[in-house]
Regions:
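Mg2+-dependent phosphoryl-transfer enzymes with acidic/Ser/Thr/Gly-rich catalytic loops
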Residues: 2-6, 23, 189-273
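Short, structured coil segments at secondary-structure junctions
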Residues: 58, 63, 71, 174-176, ...
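Active-site phosphate-binding/coordination module
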Residues: 24-125
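Hydrophobic packing residues within well-ordered alpha-helices of enzyme cores
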Residues: 26, 51-55, 166, 170, ...
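Short, hinge-like loop/turn segments at secondary-structure boundaries
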Residues: 57-61, 85-86, 125-129, 197-198, ...
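Conserved acidic, metal-coordinating active-site core of Asp-based
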Residues: 100, 104-218, 222-226, 230
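Asp-based phosphoryl-transfer active-site loop
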Residues: 3-19
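Short active-site oxyanion
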Residues: 37-41, 63-65, 153, 213-214, ...
Length: 273
C-alpha cells in the first residue's frame, strides 16, 4: 500500500503536453489516484486564474484538491475557494523591478483578477505567458503606477539567449529582498524571498497532518527542483533539465508528450505490491 497521500504536479512540461492538454491515460491515472484518496495539487508558476480552468477540467472543484500558484506564493482549496497560503512581494520592489526591466529593454508583467498586466502588449515573449495561461493581456502605460495591490510575483520575459545574464544581474541587485530564478528558457520569476514550491507544500502538509514522506512531486523545470528534492518521492520528467533529473528519485522513461505523469502515478501510487 502506497504511503503517498498528496501528489504535486507541475503543469507546463509535466502534466500537460506541448499543446497544453492532459492526455486520456494521464487523466485516467489521476482519477484512479483520487479514488484511492490522494489529494492532487496543481503546482505551477502560473497565476491562480491561469490554473483554475485545468483544475475544473480535472474535476478538482468537486472531488477536492489544491492550486499552488505563483511557484508557491499562494495555495487555494479548489472545492471551497479558501486561500490556505499567501505570500506577496514587498510593494516597494515593484517599481524597482519595473526599472530593472526597462534598463535591460525587456518586458516585465504581473497579474490582476482579469488577466496579465504588461506595458508591452505586442512583446513576443510576454505573449507566451498569454498562450500558457489562456489569460488576456491587459496593456497599461505605466506598470509601476498601475500596481497598487498586493502581487505574489512578477515575471520577466526575454529572449532565451539573454536569460542567464539578466537573471544573474537581477539576483545581484535584489539579493536578500526577492528571489529571481529562471522557470523556462524565456521566463525569469521574481517572487518574495524564500518562496518556493517546497516551502508552501510543507505548510500544506502540516495543515493536513502529513509529512514529506506522504508527498510525491513531479516536474521538469528548475523551479521544480525544490519540491522534487523535498518530496518523499521526487519524479523528474524525461524532458526535464539535467539539474532537475539529478535531484530526483526517479526519472520517467516517457516525456510530457507521452504520459510521463501517468507512468509515475501508475508506478508509485496505483501499483499494488
Amino acid at each position: 500500500m502506497s504511503d503517498i497521500k498528496v501528489l504535486a504536479l507541475d503543469l507546463d512540461g509535466t502534466l500537460t503536453n506541448d499543446q497544453k492538454l492532459v492526455t486520456p491515460r494521464t487523466r485516467a491515472a489521476l482519477d484512479a489516484a483520487i479514488a484511492k484518496g490522494v489529494t492532487i495539487v496543481l503546482a505551477s508558476g502560473r497565476p491562480t486564474a491561469g490554473i483554475q480552468p485545468l483544475a475544473e477540467e480535472l474535476g478538482l472543484d468537486k472531488k477536492g484538491g489544491c492550486i499552488l500558484s505563483y511557484n508557491g506564493g499562494k495555495i487555494v482549496d479548489c472545492r471551497t475557494g479558501e486561500t490556505l497560503v499567501e505570500k506577496t512581494l514587498d510593494p516597494a520592489l515593484v517599481p524597482e523591478l519595473c526599472a530593472f526591466a526597462a534598463a535591460q529593454d525587456i518586458a516585465i508583467l504581473t497579474y490582476n483578477r482579469e488577466g496579465i498586466v504588461c506595458e508591452r502588449d505586442k512583446d513576443e515573449w510576454a505573449n507566451k505567458e498569454c498562450f500558457t495561461t489562456k489569460l488576456p493581456m491587459i496593456h497599461v502605460d505605466d506598470l509601476a503606477s498601475y500596481v497598487n495591490y498586493p502581487v505574489c510575483k512578477m515575471l520577466i520575459t526575454l529572449d532565451p539567449a539573454r536569460r542567464d545574464a539578466v537573471c544573474a544581474a537581477g539576483q545581484q541587485q535584489f539579493a536578500g529582498r526577492a528571489d529571481l530564478y529562471p522557470s523556462s528558457p524565456f521566463f525569469i520569476e521574481a517572487v518574495p524571498r524564500g518562496v518556493a514550491k517546497d516551502d508552501s507544500l510543507a505548510e500544506l502538509l502540516r495543515r493536513m497532518g502529513l509529512t514529506r514522506e506522504n508527498l510525491m512531486a513531479c516536474g521538469d523545470g528548475l523551479n521544480d527542483r525544490s519540491m522534487i528534492a523535498y518530496a518523499g518521492v521526487g519524479v523528474a520528467m524525461q524532458n526535464a533539465e539535467q539539474p532537475v533529473k539529478d535531484c530526483a528519485d526517479y526519472v520517467t522513461t516517457a516525456d510530457n508528450n507521452h504520459d510521463g505523469v501517468a507512468e509515475a502515478v501508475e508506478k508509485f501510487i496505483l501499483r499494488e505490491d
